[in-house]
Structure formats: structure tokens, C-alpha cells
């Protein structure tokens, strides 16, 4: 097995005929001296000609091995891009990158045979207003499906539920205008805001899901909220084990979502 560097960040490894060619190129550059090290014009010309030939051979070889195979190209064409637009619960606040919601959801879906890429569209501290404001640039143009996970910070700040509903309405409409398959993730308000606020807030999600005929995952933190062993020290954000619970519960909803998105392509 031989290797060469395409750039400072990319190393290619080759074997078989590719290894033979690469080793031959290396020998050529070792055996033929630099024009600055010899006085003979003949050696210089021969070295230059061989160097140019080998350089073109190397360029051709790199272009061949670096080009995506038909299988890779086909997989990319058939893949589904799912974006999770949300707040710190989506962003993976306080967690190692691999322990966040989006990478674990992608792993869950891929383990079940889905060719999917899950994009982290979460911003810690974001409200529904913030999610709406950044929708156009936060949701990739090549996205096929979206999970909308917003509203927790609205409730924590006591924002008028009517404003939250209006923002989520616009996000759903923008998603549908883009042709995205939508999964709406519900949220509940903390009890300290009183029963009237909690009731008005909780009604936002099923109402919008029915109005726009989109699937609803009733409560994003189902099975995790108020469980000390499943949350960080702040008692609000899930830890890695908590994320596992969330993914296992929302996972089947996400499977149906991307299957629906794939069938519409």
C-alpha cells in the first residue's frame, strides 16, 4: 500500500497498479538529479522531459482516483437531506459533537438502511422568532425534509403564545413552499407560568399540525424532562443518555418523514 498527499488535509492510499505507478514516479524523481546539481545539458533535458511526463501522469492519476465512482454519485443522488431547525436541544448544548441530537439521529436512521444526511440547524437560546428570521439561510437549498423544534425558549421567557404560533405558522408555510416534508416537534411550558399560559402554549402544536396536515411528535423532551440522570447539571438540557432516549422515541417519526420525502422525489 502506497500513499500520496492531494493536499495538506487529504491523503490518498493506493494499491495494485496505482501503487506501481506511484512508486515508479517516486523512483524517477529520486534517480534523476536536479538541473541545479549537474552541469550536463543532456542530463538536464532528459530530467526535465521525464519530470514533465511524470507530472502529467501524476495529475491524471489523481484525477482518476479522486473522482467519485458511479456508485458514490448514485448514492449522493438518492440521499435525503434532513435539517433539524431548533434551539439548544437540537444544537447539542453542553455535549461533545458526536453526542448531539443530529449526529445521533443520523446514525439511528443510517443503521436502519436510510441514506440520509441530518443537518444541525440548531442555535442555542433561539426562539421561534429567531428560527423564522434565519430560516432562509439555515435551511439548505438541497434539503428534502425538516424537523421544526422551536418554542422552548419562548416558554421560558413567557413570550405570548400567539406570537409563537404566528412564527411557527410562517416557518411551516416556508417549509411547504420549499416542498419540504415537515415534522413538527411539540413543546410544553414550565408549570411556574400558570395553567392558563401552559394550556395556551401546549395547544399551539396540535393545532398547527392539524391545520397544515403535518405529522406531530407531541413533546420533544418526552421521557427525559425532570429526569436527573438524563440531563446536564442545569436540569434543562439532555445529556448524552438523554439524547439517546429522545432519538429512540422520535426516530420512527423521522423514518416516516424521510420515507415520505424520498417518495416525493
Regions found by a protein language model. Name each.
Residues 53-64:
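Bacterial N-terminal signal peptides
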Amino acid at each position: 500500500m502506497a500513499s500520496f498527499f492531494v493536499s495538506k488535509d487529504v491523503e490518498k492510499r493506493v494499491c495494485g497498479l496505482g501503487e506501481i505507478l506511484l512508486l515508479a514516479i517516486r523512483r524517477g524523481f529520486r534517480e534523476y538529479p536536479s538541473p541545479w546539481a549537474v552541469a550536463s545539458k543532456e542530463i538536464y533535458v532528459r530530467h526535465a522531459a521525464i519530470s514533465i511526463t511524470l507530472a502529467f501522469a501524476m495529475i491524471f492519476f489523481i484525477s482518476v482516483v479522486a473522482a467519485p465512482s458511479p456508485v458514490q454519485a448514485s448514492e449522493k443522488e438518492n440521499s435525503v437531506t434532513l435539517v433539524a431547525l431548533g434551539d439548544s436541544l437540537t444544537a447539542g448544548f453542553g455535549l461533545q459533537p458526536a453526542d448531539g441530537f443530529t449526529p445521533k439521529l443520523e446514525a439511528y436512521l443510517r443503521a436502519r438502511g436510510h441514506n440520509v444526511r441530518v443537518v444541525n440547524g440548531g442555535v442555542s437560546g433561539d426562539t421561534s422568532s429567531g428560527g423564522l428570521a434565519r430560516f432562509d439561510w439555515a435551511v439548505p437549498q438541497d434539503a428534502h425534509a425538516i424537523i421544526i423544534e422551536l418554542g422552548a425558549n419562548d416558554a421560558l421567557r413567557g413570550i405570548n403564545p400567539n406570537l409563537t404560533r404566528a412564527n411557527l405558522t410562517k416557518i411551516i408555510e416556508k417549509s411547504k413552499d420549499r416542498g419540504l416534508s415537515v415534522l413538527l416537534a411539540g413543546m410544553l411550558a414550565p408549570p411556574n407560568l400558570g395553567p392558563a399560559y401552559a394550556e395556551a402554549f401546549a395547544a399551539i402544536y396540535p393545532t398547527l399540525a392539524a391545520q397544515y396536515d403535518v405529522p406531530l411528535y407531541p413533546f420533544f423532551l418526552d421521557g427525559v424532562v425532570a429526569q436527573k440522570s438524563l440531563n446536564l447539571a442545569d436540569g434543562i438540557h439532555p445529556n448524552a443518555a438523554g439524547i439517546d432516549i429522545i432519538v429512540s422515541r422520535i426516530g420512527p417519526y423521522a423514518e416516516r418523514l424521510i420515507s415520505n420525502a424520498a417518495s416525493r422525489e
